Amino acid sequence: MQPEILVLDEPAAGLDPETKHEIFELLCRIREKRNNAIVLVSHHMEDVAQFANRVWVMYKGKIAMDGTPEEVYSRVEELEEMNIGIPQITHLTYSLIKEGVPLPRPAISVKEAEKMLAEILKEEKPL
């Protein structure tokens, strides 16, 4: 059987971090090799931010947001109003932006936050 669309409901729920990582790596390989669409239902926003290339946010039974992870997670205040969790790194970088750190947008991964902060530090002039 070679389905065009694979629908998974909380595929990593209850798994240890290593096994969860292996599951998501396997799903990425399946998506790339077979060119499948994978619909992932999850409440774990870090997984969604890392795995998805498109995110739909459901709120009160309707699609409230639709976009790339970067687009969706940059709408921090709206997500918080809907009581939707965001990745911890997104929350941290959003807080930095509110404090005046000139990040382009909230980051969705630690690696992305590192790159953004390194770029800012590179642009800083020595005292």
Q: Which stretches of residues belong to each language-model region?
A:
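H-loop/switch region of ABC-family ATPase nucleotide-binding domains
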Residues: 42-43
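Catalytic Walker B motif of ABC-type/P-loop ATPase nucleotide-binding domains
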Residues: 6-9
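Helix N-cap at the start of a conserved alpha-helix in ABC-type nucleotide-binding domains
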Residues: 17-19
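A short, proline-enriched helix->beta-strand linker immediately N-terminal to the Walker B motif
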Residues: 1-4
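ABC ATPase nucleotide-binding domains
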Residues: 80-127
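ABC ATPase "signature
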Residues: 66-67
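A short, surface-exposed alpha-helical micro-motif characterized by mixed small hydrophobic
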Residues: 48-50
